[in-house]
Amino acid sequence: MTDTQSPFSFAAALLQCGSPGQTFSMESLLKPELGEYSPSGENGIDGEESTICSVCCDEASGRHYGVVACFGCKGFFRRTVRAGKNYVCRYSKKCRIDKAGRNVCRSCRFQKCLEVGMEPDAIRPDRDKTGRQKNPRRNTEGSIKKVSVGSILGDLPCLNKFKDDSDDAATSPSSRADSAPMDLRPSFIDESVLTTLTEIENIVIQLQDNFETNQQSLPPMGEAITKPSLIAARTLLNFNGAKGVADANCVSSNLRRMIVFTFDYINTLRPIADLHPSEKLVIARSIISPFCILFCGYQSVAIEAPEHDSIYLPSGHKLPASQLLFTKDSDQKKYILLENKADNVRRNMTEMIIQQLRRLNVTKTEMVALKAIMALDHNVKGLSAESCELLVVARESVQNALFSHLIATFGTAEATSRFAHLLLLIASATRVAYSLSSFFQLSRDVNYEIDYVLEELLFLDRI
């Protein structure tokens, strides 16, 4: 089995991945040549057993398969050995395996497990606590080890209840079990889901290419889904509008940049990140237009600009309501039709998305949850039954986490209403996406040339 996981994997979004202003690149995920701490032994000071995982340097939960390790690395090693998986590194076997990036490359992580002394022969169903047991053992309160947040967030936590070989969430403490029945605070798992989604957002927004990219005008979509830089370079996402008014070509370039952002997000959010590239592309085609619309709308509100009727773009340009998008030539009628259609899209975007986001005062936590709910849609043609099942579980975990967060923040009655209004934003984004698709249809009818990537991905007639 070949490791098809993206370099911008889910684990790269864990806590302590860097300061908010840091720029992340592929190089930051690779092994440094010198100076990195790596546990060289299993004993701490004065012969005491180390509390640091020998594989990823996270907080260890005990001795597993011959070495001191965390639950995450223990479970990863056990699943790999039991399934007989054979991973292949795509980055010259130089991937850095630490707390923040341990899931960047499964091949290098498994090799690190072997290097520090994990023993495949130690995995026995009759002795492995998470496998079949001849004599099942019960936990006592005194035997429960501490587990750090970084060790638990390898996946969306509620996904683990779907996997029979899950370890992290099954062994981690949950505040839900310790809370009184009437306690409205979100559970530890719910908080973990929202924290992870926020970290994913921060990572993907900060991604920039620090090398020259091979951008193509006609990139093959099957390849671009795993190499988004074929579509556009990862330039700084800056929605401040300081560069002035955008024209039609500028809008096209910005749409390409937001498509790259969406691809990076898809390649980061599990379980989507673990799917086959063909299934990732199917998901991308189904969500990319409303996803970009919701992303752009939220950023236009978040900057708190005085022009409430303008749409702000990631290049630093803006689209005021009164500004013409096209430069007219001799074919006056064609451009009048196109301008009217473009104005319809702009008006729908402003009224259905931007004004609603501003009215609801949507928070970043709510927005990252909404985007994940949109992306984790299993009702997409072309997905396997197994993939659909994974998406269902993941989506429900995000929905539950969001609702628990709303109850804790607003109380039950208001939370129910707000939850419904937030979900309606997804429907509104889809309506705006159809008006954008209508613009592309008119462009085709009047022989106005459309960017290949935009027509391929944003024209809903192709879905």
UniProtKB/Swiss-Prot annotation:
Tell me the Gene Ontology biological-process terms attached to this UniProt entry: hormone-mediated signaling pathway; regulation of transcription by RNA polymerase II; tissue development
Q: Which family does it belong to?
A: Belongs to the nuclear hormone receptor family.
User: What role does it play?
Assistant: Orphan nuclear receptor.
Gene Ontology cellular component?
RNA polymerase II transcription regulator complex
Q: Where is this region: Disordered?
A: 121-143
Q: What is this protein called?
A: Nuclear hormone receptor family member nhr-3
Location of the DNA-binding region in this protein? 50-125
* Molecular functions (GO terms): DNA-binding transcription factor activity; RNA polymerase II cis-regulatory region sequence-specific DNA binding; zinc ion binding
Q: Which UniProt keywords apply?
A: DNA-binding, Metal-binding, Nucleus, Receptor, Transcription, Transcription regulation, Zinc, Zinc-finger
Pfam families linked to this entry: Hormone_recep, zf-C4
Q: Where are the NR C4-type Zn fingers located?
A: 53-73, 89-113
Which segments constitute the NR LBD domain?
Answer: 199-462
| Compositional bias of kind Basic and acidic residues | 121-131
Question: Subcellular location, in the record's words?
Answer: Nucleus
UniProt main location, coarse: nucleus
